[in-house]
């Protein structure tokens, strides 16, 4: 049964208001729904319905985390909002069992999340949050929002009161500065990977296509284009700034960087050390999974079986210095090889920018709270171990952040595998209880040196022998 969206009550003071309904706030809403002592909650999302990266739901593309990294299981395996229960309700549990798939298709994960989003009460799609204010007299936040019609136009204004807020506004496509001139309208299509499927047919009409970016999205798009092009007339370039088309670190001990243990360790490090670590760990979250790399090589090799090499060029270690349009029908890229210190030009008919995402800035949304918001030396919001913004003593309510704290919590901040744990951490802190008991240890790796236990009796020191 689909839950009918309730009209927000303008007089009620909620316990929690969520802003943004992506996987992370959807996880929070699902676990909040299962609390033994119910919370009054409302979650707002500007989009008309839940959709998870619709432009990247490429046929056959899978998640890079196991299905256990759903919205709830790693905090509450008995929750009715688990992926396995979704499979049961769809009468697909036995087929899934026999499929023996630990990593599910992205389209299936999207369908699962949409199923949850249509069942949970208190989710308000088509609502744009405009401002957040602190009301000291009533010790609560005022959340101003606009209800949008089916065309995205303003329909009515509203205000919701709440004791606490969870920001889950997600990320937005990132386009590096040298590539921004390409985003102007022109006959040669230049699109971000986030919109790939929406423009795929138009891209395939181009004689030559260039994919820029060495991460998983770039690899999947290159593979999809390669499979769609005729042998010998592929007309593809794949450029990467990284020194290699490198695999993602997926060893079992390497994956322990995506545990609560490592998150706590990272948060306790000095700010300067954290800032040094994050870019060094790019292969933990920006590499390509082994299966995709193998599939690309297999497809390229298959195209050599009858002699000749495919018309596909894969070049790592390349940065785009400048870019522009040629006669409005083609694109010219000025390239530099970082190891050779050589430069060249590449003219192409279409470009896919698989250049990643950045956290959405919070400053506009938090404009009225700016005097209370404490920042680090780089001007970023400080976030404590419970994922709360440091707002100073004048604001007694909490604002929790989800996927806006990589600078304080490390590479696991955007990882789906930590979604349920972070949601449970937030709810335990918000309620002051432990409705979701969390494991004390989650990794075999001991990150850092632990403080030695103080012995009950001072040991006798034995002098070191001189050589």
Positions of predicted regions on the chain:
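Tryptophan-centered motif/residue detector
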Residues: 52, 83-86, 115
